[in-house]
């Protein structure tokens, strides 16, 4: 397991972050590749022959090997410059092998494609690659790779001459590879940014300490009087001590000076050292500012969430105290803020909002589809309906004893409990009475949303709960787009209400069809739904009766007296409702005369005790229902006449109209089976009606 983890860790350095599981070779999906506007983004992935992609994992591995050699060079160059004379020993052989690797890299660079800074496309023409390299870093790479230590042996002076030792310091040019590596790792999402920055700052600090110590020792070593140096004043025979002891002493002086500790035991003894120490301390001023600034930025960024959280808590506490809010509301406010802070990393709503809708829909479908599918309200609906619905779902966390829904609150959302538990309470007198409980997988708030009624319960959490919220607008759009699924939802709600003892249904033959038709605001045949969405003062209910029952003005008056039976007929027709923004808000009637307004009340408590609405209708603007055509027959012993007419609003009007057509006085209406009809609601379009003559006329 440890070997596999180590292999995967080092693989991150060699493979681009977007190519880990997709392409093995010559992959171009890189964070550095960004085609310009209008350019082709599907650039061919096949380069010219003998041209290497800079994003090839094998080339990335080669670069990582060179970075390791650069780290070695960064340490050995100042160390050899100050402490070691050039000799044909093992260190001499290692240095030349390292130089050989960098010489190979110089040749290899002529065959590596580069990223054009203007088009952000790879350039694989050998001529352009060569011109670009020769005009930029070629000379510096050659100077940093030249074996000056070996060349010094060809001259009469030995390899310890200061001139060749200075030229060997050109190998520090290779450090640009380390800088490029850190710049790439800081943008790589697979590596922690904080620890990447800390590693970079620590590396820079150690390199500065190492170089300063080596340079300080070199000045003391080259001074004509060893006892008049910063190290000779303490160790007169320091040149006779081991290299390790001298190197540790130099590091000790360097770190105490860099950290401005300055114990005073090691200090400058001659003007040459004093001048170097002055410049080194000036360098320390800028370098310390760089370190402190970067570390402060990292720490502040790390603790900014906590600081913002404490500021929010303090502001909420001051607001509650200033407005003298009750203790229970204060507790809910603080609990909600604390829970939001703890679950901020789980939601990341801002990050999701920045993604394209297709990606957000895929995430929501993966997270919420199985949960919504098991809710009783959506049993039997199509997958397309659920997919459209889950795309607009929001997940929220609620602490214990927090109100999710308030009793008599305007219905705005439907909730699904994912984890935790909630209680349904009703405020009676001066105390709350628990009417029920919801467990994981239950939905609540559906009665208010689907029945256009204020919420019948207060829903309060009893423990830490995760709840999915579906807005009324999203549910409305989905049900309009899938009418059959909307009918299934209403049937599921109806069966749930019939099965609950606390929500009794007196009429078992009632159907939820009329509720569905009332809920579908602004149907497909009309554009009235847009008026409501745009803030206009009208709301239209498209209520289509499956039996096309006619309704006259007399029934509007009768509906106010006869309760549910007549109200059902009223609701099953197309009407125009003048009201405010909220469905359960009464229209104030301003601007209309008393003669224009007919007020009535939907009393559907017998079937749905929580589905009620007080709405005022502007009668003269009410849409006319579809007229029913019926055939009336004169039924007598010696005559059989028939006429096709428009069905009037009542049986009395029908008998009067038949009397005008046939010239007789009629008393009864029957159908083809000789069954007497005393209610016009049972008459359908196209029926044949038989009129009985009053024998006394």
UniProtKB/Swiss-Prot annotation:
GO terms of molecular function: voltage-gated potassium channel activity
Topological region Extracellular: 85-91, 156-165, 222-248, 269-272
Keyword terms of this UniProt record: Glycoprotein, Ion channel, Ion transport, Membrane, Potassium, Potassium channel, Potassium transport, Transmembrane, Transmembrane helix, Transport, Voltage-gated channel
Intramembrane parts of the chain: 249-268
A GO cellular component annotation in the UniProt record: monoatomic ion channel complex
Glycan-modified residues: 158
The keyword Nucleus is annotated on this UniProt entry: no
KHA domain sequence ranges: 629-697
Lipid bilayer topology: Multi-pass membrane protein
Tissue: Expressed in guard cells of hypocotyls, stems leaves and petioles. Detected also in the phloem of minor veins and in flower at a lower level.
Annotated GO biological process: circadian rhythm; response to high light intensity; stomatal movement
Superkingdom as given in the UniProt entry: Eukaryota
Segments passing through the bilayer: 64-84, 92-112, 135-155, 166-186, 201-221, 273-293
Gene3D superfamilies in the record: 1.10.287.70, Helix hairpin bin, Jelly Rolls
Topology Cytoplasmic: residue spans: 1-63, 113-134, 187-200, 294-697
Intracellular or extracellular location(s): Membrane
InterPro entries in the cross-refs: cNMP-bd_dom, cNMP-bd_dom_sf, Ion_trans_dom, K_chnl_volt-dep_EAG/ELK/ERG, KAT/AKT, KHA_dom, RmlC-like_jellyroll
Family the UniProt entry places it in: Belongs to the potassium channel family. Plant (TC 1.A.1.4) subfamily.
Free-text comment on this protein's domains from its UniProt entry: The segment S4 is probably the voltage-sensor and is characterized by a series of positively charged amino acids. The pore-forming region H5 is enclosed by the transmembrane segments S5 and S6 in the Shaker-type (1P/6TM) and contains the GYGD signature motif which seems to be involved in potassium selectivity. The KHA domain (rich in hydrophobic and acidic residues) present in the C-terminal part is likely to be important for tetramerization.
Protein name from the UniProt record: Potassium channel KAT2
Species the sequence originates in: Arabidopsis thaliana
């Amino acid at each position: 397991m440890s070997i596999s983890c180590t292999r995967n860790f080092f693989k991150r350095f060699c493979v681009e972050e977007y190519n880990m599981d997709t392409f093995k070779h010559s992959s171009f999906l890189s964070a550095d590749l960004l085609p310009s506007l209008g350019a082709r983004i599907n650039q061919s992935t096949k380069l010219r022959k003998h041209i290497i992609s800079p994003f090839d994992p094998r080339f990335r591995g080669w670069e990582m090997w060179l970075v390791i050699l650069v780290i070695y060079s960064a340490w050995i160059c100042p160390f050899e410059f100050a402490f070691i004379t050039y000799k044909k020993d093992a260190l001499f052989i290692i240095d030349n092998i390292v130089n050989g690797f960098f010489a190979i890299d110089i040749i290899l660079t002529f065959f590596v494609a580069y990223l054009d800074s203007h088009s952000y496309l790879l350039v694989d023409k050998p001529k352009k690659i060569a011109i670009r390299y020769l005009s930029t870093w070629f000379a510096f790479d050659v100077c940093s790779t030249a074996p000056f230590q070996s060349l010094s042996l060809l001259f009469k002076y030995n390899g310890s001459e200061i001139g060749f030792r200075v030229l060997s310091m050109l190998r520090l040019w290779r450090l640009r590879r380390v800088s490029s590596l850190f710049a790439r790792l800081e943008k790589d999402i697979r590596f922690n940014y904080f620890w990447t920055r800390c590693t970079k700052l620590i590396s820079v600090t150690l390199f500065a300490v190492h170089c300063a110590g080596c340079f300080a020792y070199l000045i003391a070593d080259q001074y004509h009087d060893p006892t008049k140096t910063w190290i000779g004043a303490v160790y007169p025979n320091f040149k006779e001590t081991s290299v390790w002891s001298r190197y540790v002493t130099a590091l000790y002086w360097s770190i105490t000076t860099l950290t401005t500790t300055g114990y005073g035991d090691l200090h400058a003894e001659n003007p040459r050292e004093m001048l170097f120490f002055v410049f080194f301390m000036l360098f320390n001023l800028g370098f310390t500012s760089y370190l402190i600034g970067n570390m402060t930025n990292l720490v502040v960024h790390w603790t900014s969430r906590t600081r913002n959280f404490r500021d929010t808590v303090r502001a909420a506490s001051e607001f509650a105290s200033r407005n003298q809010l009750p203790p229970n509301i204060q507790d809910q406010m603080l609990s909600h803020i604390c829970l939001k802070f703890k679950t901020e990393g789980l939601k990341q709503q801002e990050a999701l909002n920045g993604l394209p809708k297709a990606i957000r829909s895929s995430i929501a479908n993966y997270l919420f589809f199985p949960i919504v599918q098991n809710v009783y309200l959506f049993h039997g609906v199509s997958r397309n309906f659920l997919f459209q619905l889950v795309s607009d779902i929001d997940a929220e966390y609620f602490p214990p004893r927090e109100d999710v829904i308030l009793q008599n609150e305007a219905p705005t959302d439907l909730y699904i409990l994912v984890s935790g538990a909630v209680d349904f309470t009703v405020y009676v007198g001066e105390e709350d009475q628990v009417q029920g409980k919801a467990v994981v997988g239950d939905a609540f708030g559906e009665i208010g949303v689907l029945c256009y009624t204020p919420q019948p319960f207060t829903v309060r959490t009893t423990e830490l709960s995760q709840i999915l919220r579906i807005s009324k607008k999203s549910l409305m759009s989905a049900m309009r787009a899938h009418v059959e699924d909307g009918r299934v939802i209403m049937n599921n709600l109806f069966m749930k209400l019939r099965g609950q003892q606390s929500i009794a249904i007196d009429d078992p033959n009632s159907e939820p069809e009329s509720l569905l038709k009332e809920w579908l605001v602004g149907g497909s045949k009309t554009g009235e739904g847009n008026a409501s969405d745009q803030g206009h003062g009208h709301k239209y209910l498209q209520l289509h009766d499956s039996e096309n029952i006619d309704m006259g003005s007399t029934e509007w008056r009768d509906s106010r007296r006869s309760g549910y039976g007549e109200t059902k007929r009223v609701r099953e027709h197309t009407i125009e409702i003048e009201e405010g923004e909220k469905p359960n808000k009464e229209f104030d009637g301003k601007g209309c005369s008393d003669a224009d307004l007919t007020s009535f009340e939907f009393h559907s408590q017998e079937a749905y005790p929580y589905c009620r609405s007080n709405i005022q209708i502007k009668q003269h603007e009410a849409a006319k229902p579809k007229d029913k055509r019926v055939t009336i027959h004169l039924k007598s012993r010696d005559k059989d006449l028939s006429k096709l007419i428009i069905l009037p609003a009542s049986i009395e009007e029908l008998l009067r109209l038949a009397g005008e057509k046939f010239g007789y006085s009629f008393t009864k209406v029957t159908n083809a089976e000789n069954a007497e009809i005393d209610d016009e609601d049972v008459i359908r379009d196209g029926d044949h009606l038989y009129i009985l003559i009053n024998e006394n006329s």
